[in-house]
Design a protein with these regions (language model features):
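N-terminal export signals
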Residues: 5-23
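N-terminal intrinsically disordered, low-complexity segments enriched in P/E/S/T
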Residues: 21-192
């Protein structure tokens, strides 16, 4: 896909999500920002629609059911603040959002020790992560950076991120090597 076409499609995501009732959380009033699929017990949307779920379809994502969160639903979950040094400017920033495991639990995700997740960003970047690592490293789904909501086109609107400065095996690495498992512009999580 050409970069310009991708960026145009990405900027239209909120409009597509708002137009597709299956893409919004049951109690949500805004567009879906995050879709959880796979081994989940709760659902509020049906299967992928190849015509309307263009980004997922082009990234070869397939599912029969899912659970979506809009901004309000994510904001309603208990949130924590972390303060990692970011690779982009070498400065400490405050990132706030719910723990990834709390987001998964809200969707009724399978939480056994053997479970794993794939975290996928809008550009197709995907990270496979054992659920135990997500718990141990206290991944959050950040919605705010330095007290402000994160925008699409920056690191947001959602970023699966850790406080790498406080994880011993990562804190010893150069800053630009600490966030390889932290996709920004997160929009899909598959649980298996």
């Amino acid at each position: 896909m050409h970069k310009r076409a991708f960026l145009g499609a990405a900027s239209a995501l909120p409009l597509l999500a708002a137009a597709a009732p299956a893409s919004t959380a049951a109690s949500a009033s805004g567009p879906a920002l995050l879709t959880i699929t796979g081994q989940i017990a709760r659902t509020n949307r049906g299967p992928i629609d190849p015509a309307l779920d263009q980004m997922m379809h082009k990234q070869k994502i397939s599912f029969d059911k899912g659970f979506t969160f809009d901004y309000g639903a994510l904001s309603a979950l208990p949130a924590i603040t972390i303060r990692p040094t970011l690779e982009y400017d070498g400065k400490v920033h405050a990132l706030r959002g719910p723990l990834l495991v709390d987001v998964l639990a809200a969707a009724g995700a399978r939480m056994q020790a053997s479970a794993a997740v794939t975290l996928r960003a809008v550009d197709g970047f995907a990270v496979d992560l054992p659920l135990e690592a997500a718990k141990r490293q206290r991944f959050i789904v950040a919605t705010h950076l330095d007290g402000k909501p994160m925008a699409l086109g920056g690191l947001g609107p959602l970023w699966a991120v850790i406080d790498a400065d406080r994880i011993a095996d990562l804190a010893n690495k150069p800053v630009n090597e600490r966030f390889g498992q932290c996709p920004w512009a997160l929009y899909h999580i598959d649980v298996r």
